[in-house]
């Protein structure tokens, strides 16, 4: 049984734009799967449909054999606990401390009123500190998040996702706003988490070099359709040209040196 399965999934927006068209795709446990394609190809729509940030129009998506598409209420909350999310723009509470931001990864486990009052049990704080140590910013735990660099803020986001104790992490263009050196550090963190903890990574990336360097698998989308799914080791220039429908530009190859 695949960890994530897309079954005939389509997404049509209210304005008639087709975001996804008849997607059939299996993501296996432990994959580091990179989604690539032009802007507007459906990468974010595909990624965000996994945890229902975007609802699909047709088909079904299952997590560990259970339909998240049909899940409601407590069942949906329970399924979302296992899916961490990392965004391009970090989505941190800038005035809060690093530790408090990471602890927000535990909100799905406790009543809302306790989270508003900051009543996190000791066990949660231990989990949060462990997550910060894993991404090498434990020493920043008591600083305000907006006092840190972009790369450090993205590492807070990764730690927050880890604090959730997920089996899957979705990463939506997590390095798009970072410089090359910081990009490498963040991608190294994600790869280490994938390899050491066995957490499945499903990630959107703009740079094809990064996709080949870090991915175990490449998923190519064009105009909402799945046009490639195969090992990263087999994804050569011809494959990427097919995915993009044209030759790859230099600024799409800028990756880790």
UniProtKB/Swiss-Prot annotation:
What InterPro entries does the entry give?
A: AAA+_ATPase, ABC_transporter-like_ATP-bd, ABC_transporter-like_CS, ABC_transpr_PhnC, MetN_ABC_transporter-like, P-loop_NTPase
A Pfam family annotated for this chain is ABC_tran
Print the organism lineage.
Bacteria, Bacillati, Bacillota, Bacilli, Bacillales
What name does UniProt use for this protein?
A: Phosphonates import ATP-binding protein PhnC
For this chain, one GO molecular function annotation is:
ATP binding
Indicate where this protein resides in the cell.
Cell membrane
Record keywords, A-Z: ATP-binding, Cell membrane, Membrane, Nucleotide-binding, Phosphonate transport, Translocase, Transport
Function summary? Part of the ABC transporter complex PhnCDE involved in phosphonates import. Responsible for energy coupling to the transport system.
Enzyme class, first EC level, given as a word: translocase
Could you tell me the membrane topology recorded for this protein?
A: Peripheral membrane protein
Q: Which PANTHER family match?
A: AMINO ACID IMPORT ATP-BINDING PROTEIN (PTHR43166), PHOSPHONATES IMPORT ATP-BINDING PROTEIN PHNC (PTHR43166:SF6)
Record: residues binding ATP: 37-44
The annotated subunit structure for this chain is: The complex is composed of two ATP-binding proteins (PhnC), two transmembrane proteins (PhnE) and a solute-binding protein (PhnD).
The catalysed reaction is: phosphonate(out) + ATP + H2O = phosphonate(in) + ADP + phosphate + H(+)
Its gene name is: phnC
């Amino acid at each position: 049984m695949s960890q994530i399965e897309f079954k005939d999934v389509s997404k049509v927006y209210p304005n008639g734009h087709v975001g996804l068209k008849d997607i059939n795709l299996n993501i296996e446990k432990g994959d580091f799967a990179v989604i690539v394609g032009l802007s507007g190809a459906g990468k974010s729509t595909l990624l965000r449909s996994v945890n229902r940030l975007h609802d699909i129009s047709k088909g079904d998506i299952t997590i560990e054999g259970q339909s998240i598409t049909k899940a409601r209420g407590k069942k949906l909350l329970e399924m979302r606990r296992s899916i961490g999310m990392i965004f391009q723009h970090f989505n941190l509470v800038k005035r809060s401390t690093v530790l408090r931001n990471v602890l927000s990864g535990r909100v799905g486990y406790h009543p809302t009123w306790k989270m508003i009052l900051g009543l996190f049990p000791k066990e949660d704080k231990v989990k949060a500190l462990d997550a910060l140590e894993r991404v090498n910013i434990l020493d920043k735990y008591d600083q305000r998040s907006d006092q840190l660099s972009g790369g450090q803020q993205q590492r807070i986001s990764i730690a927050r996702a880890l604090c959730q104790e997920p089996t899957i992490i979705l990463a939506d263009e997590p390095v798009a706003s970072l410089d090359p050196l910081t990009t490498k550090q963040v991608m190294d963190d994600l790869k280490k988490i994938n390899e050491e903890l066995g957490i499945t990574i499903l990630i959107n990336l703009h740079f094809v070099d990064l996709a080949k360097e870090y991915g175990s698998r490449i998923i190519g989308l064009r105009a909402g359709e799945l046009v490639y799914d195969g090992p990263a080791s087999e994804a050569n220039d011809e494959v990427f040209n097919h995915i993009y429908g044209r030759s790859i530009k230099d600024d799409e190859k800028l990756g880790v040196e």
